[in-house]
Amino acid sequence: MSPIDALFLSAESREHPLHVGALQLFEPPAGAGRGFVRETYQAMLQCREIAPLFRKRPTSLHGALINLGWSTDADVDLGYHARRSALPAPGRVRELLELTSRLHSNLLDRHRPLWETHVIEGLRDGRFAIYSKMHHALVDGVSGLTLMRQPMTTDPIEGKLRTAWSPATQHTAIKRRRGRLQQLGGMLGSVAGLAPSTLRLARSALIEQQLTLPFGAPHTMLNVAVGGARRCAAQSWPLDRVKAVKDAAGVSLNDVVLAMCAGALREYLDDNDALPDTPLVAMVPVSLRTDRDSVGGNMVGAVLCNLATHLDDPADRLNAIHASMRGNKNVLSQLPRAQALAVSLLLLSPAALNTLPGLAKATPPPFNVCISNVPGAREPLYFNGARMVGNYPMSLVLDGQALNITLTSTADSLDFGVVGCRRSVPHVQRVLSHLETSLKELERAVGL
């Protein structure tokens, strides 16, 4: 087991579940009978060939961190890991998200491989859902979403049902992209070998370009210690609406997404009499790949974006966000790989402090919220003939970072998954209505 995987396992507690998940929503095929979901679930249980990743469980000697390792289960109880649930009446999306929130709050059983899949029926409109989760020691959020898409096909009538745990879904090796904390851990090891001059250059890049720096974020109700219970919210927006704002304003799609989130967070905090005078700061993962990079390589960094929540005008906020992201990405893309790595380390290393008990209260937040836009499928996807109409990432929250917003694309929509600490972030579902309001304000601001 790698030191980073061991860190995820050792840092987990009842208050800090460290798994990532996704809620996928499906529309049964035309003519599907009342038993379609049950039959689909039974067919999933017949997929008894299980990939090695789904057989791994942690083991330790006398509880010592340095002796943590992986064991391989020869006999995986699929009836335990793959479960079927039914929603109570009236079967609204509200009931679905309440169940998802409870499932996302529960720790995975360390005596078994660290994953679960829940097939959920009972939605009154006939749709069904699949909620899946895996421990962050096995996958990060991006590779987890990729893995959960593996059973999908672009052909609605393809006959053979596949599952995420089936070896057949592993024909393309999943290159694990580092998540926020895994990326930090990897950078800690890599940057140790950098020459001092490289670090000085990276530090100069931050100061001379006047980039957004850690610890410049205001302390808010989102930056407190968290409990173990989670509240999940999810909603989709037409991709065309966001693209129309992008084209009219001459900015990137991610700039518009960040502006949507900025407006929503501004209203949410204002509703709670907690809007600070200084702007919120978001941690935003970005791709640093250039045309010169090989296909197999990864170049992923992170920047801190000024969300301009102190500005009343949505157009001004969008312009400020565009300028902040452009400046940050330009500096990182022009640096050699080692220096870009060092800059990302300087930006993210303070976040590691908040993983230690009590320090979330004692230190200013390095940033206020993580907002991640994960590339998704460009074509409609199907599972056993059922079209996937929503794919909502469910990430993790940490002490000092009580809210997470992650989104991905599904064909012609953007699917937002919002996860908050149930105790620290009340009525997290209101963030969704504020996102819609924020998008409408942006549309008006650019003349749409």
Curated annotation (Swiss-Prot):
This is Putative diacyglycerol O-acyltransferase Rv3740c. It comes from Mycobacterium tuberculosis (strain ATCC 25618 / H37Rv). InterPro entries: Acyl_transf_WS/DGAT, O-acyltransferase_WSD1-like, O-acyltransferase_WSD1_C, O-acyltransferase_WSD1_N. Upon expression in E.coli has a weak triacylglycerol synthase function, making triacylglycerol (TG) from diolein and long-chain fatty acyl-CoA. Also functions weakly as a wax synthase, as it incorporates palmityl alcohol into wax esters in the presence of palmitoyl-CoA. GO terms for molecular function: diacylglycerol O-acyltransferase activity; long-chain-alcohol O-fatty-acyltransferase activity; O-acyltransferase activity. Pathway: Glycerolipid metabolism; triacylglycerol biosynthesis. Induction: A possible member of the dormancy regulon. Induced in response to reduced oxygen tension (hypoxia) and low levels of nitric oxide (NO). It is hoped that this regulon will give insight into the latent, or dormant phase of infection. Was identified as a high-confidence drug target. Its EC number is 2.3.1.20. GO terms for cellular component: plasma membrane. It catalyses: an acyl-CoA + a 1,2-diacyl-sn-glycerol = a triacyl-sn-glycerol + CoA; di-(9Z)-octadecenoylglycerol + (9Z)-octadecenoyl-CoA = 1,2,3-tri-(9Z-octadecenoyl)-glycerol + CoA; hexadecan-1-ol + hexadecanoyl-CoA = hexadecanyl hexadecanoate + CoA. The active site is at H136. Signal peptide: none annotated. It comes from the Bacteria. One of its GO terms (biological process) is biological process involved in interaction with host. Keywords: Acyltransferase, Glycerol metabolism, Lipid biosynthesis, Lipid metabolism, Transferase.
